[in-house]
Amino acid sequence: MIKECPGARLHLTIVPSQSQASTVTRVELERGGQRQTLAPPPEMADYTAVGLGCAQDKTGTDYFVVQYGELPYGCEFCEWFFLYDTQGRLLNHATPPLREQDHQQSPNNDEYEGKLEELGLKHPELMPFQP
């Protein structure tokens, strides 16, 4: 899957594996003809990239959003969002990944939401990955 963003292109692909159906993906950032792999957040070791989006602040600075979850079926309460700058640097974390309130689990996107507010960004419309 390819997501076109201003000045860049994001690639989301399945990582080949020995098993028949791989559920691991890789995200690459392409700028100026060069590709670099975006490092997944360490806390997402048990999850994989499932969506891509583009965001731009009021000054025109571009950012990229990668959504993490599970493939191929998704999961009940896992939609984490991570913000990257144009150099491919991860700008937020989700530590711990899950929070529990009133015996209900939900994804911890607090730092992501704080970064959006700090940078004056709106959560973008995300393109979901369809394996």
Where would I find each of the regions flagged by the language model?
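Beta-strand-enriched, solvent-exposed domains that form extended recognition/catalytic surfaces
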Residues: 18-21, 33
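Short, surface-exposed coil-to-beta transition loops
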Residues: 24, 47-51, 63-64, 75-80
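Surface-exposed loop/turn elements that mediate protein-protein interactions on large endomembrane-trafficking
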Residues: 26-43, 80-96
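Acidic, small-residue rich beta-repeat scaffolds with periodic aromatic anchors
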Residues: 1-9, 15-19, 71-131
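Acidic/hydrophobic-patterned starts of short beta strands in beta-sheet-rich repeat architectures
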Residues: 11, 57-69
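Structural signature of eukaryotic scaffold interfaces centered on beta-propeller domains
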Residues: 1-7, 52-59
